[in-house]
């Protein structure tokens, strides 16, 4: 009997979900009980995933780029600023790859389009949440289409059951895999002083985020108090688009820009890997946020 083929799906335009399943892929590869396929959306995503793995673990895996044709990629670029059309196009273009495996492990639910399209030919789909947040979208009815959920704790099991999404017997508590990719004893330092460090972590959703109405006021408060350090580190998707639309709340808003001329006690990062590798949550003394599960990552230290 041949070994099962397990595909770990990294199909996003940003790399913030990678650390939630990369370690699981490594653990399966080390056991040698299955073929492990890493399906990735962009070269940047691959680089981030490889950075989370040891060279030995990476060598045990098959790497499958979810490429689009240059013409299609270019044609979708304008629409992709508003909706995740490239992500959806990859799922259609590489449907044969998905049909060739036994299990697909994903940190988000877009992949369920593949399951519905393949019907009886579909592999089993396993969900690993990219975080442990409590937004209503976490309990979207589509989530019931997953065959198994690997979750961080009993809270998630209870809530999935309470919302009629997943019975307890189809959930497994595995902890928070992202913690396995980070040295929790290290505390990064971003300011040349011993002043308290506040982390401001606004979300991108225009209905839920504080950035649209209060972001500039938060920055102004710290600009007026140089004895307090502020790291402005929003959800990585906030500054990837100027116009944000919330499917969940049917709300669209234009994102305000970062104000100019900020003092030295304010650090702004809108695009680097530090936004999601826990550098800032480990550095902070105080967390200011909206709905992100980064609050749990802050509490972990």
What is each PLM-predicted segment?
Residues 264-273:
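Active-site donor-binding acidic/aromatic loop of nucleotide-activated sugar
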Residues 2-14, 199-200:
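Nucleotide-activated donor-dependent transferases that construct or modify glycoconjugates
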Residues 17-31, 179-257:
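Conserved catalytic-core segment of nucleotide-activated headgroup transferases in glycan assembly
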Residues 93-95, 219, 276-278:
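Short hydrophobic/charged patches on amphipathic alpha-helices used for structural packing
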Residues 6, 104, 149, 198, ...:
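Receiver (REC) domain switch-region micro-motif
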Residues 127, 272-301:
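A donor-sugar binding/catalytic signature common to diverse glycosyltransferases
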Residues 9-27, 38-183:
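Active-site and donor-binding regions of nucleotide-sugar-utilizing enzymes
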Residues 1-3, 29-33, 96-101, 119-120, ...:
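Flexible, charged surface loops at secondary-structure boundaries
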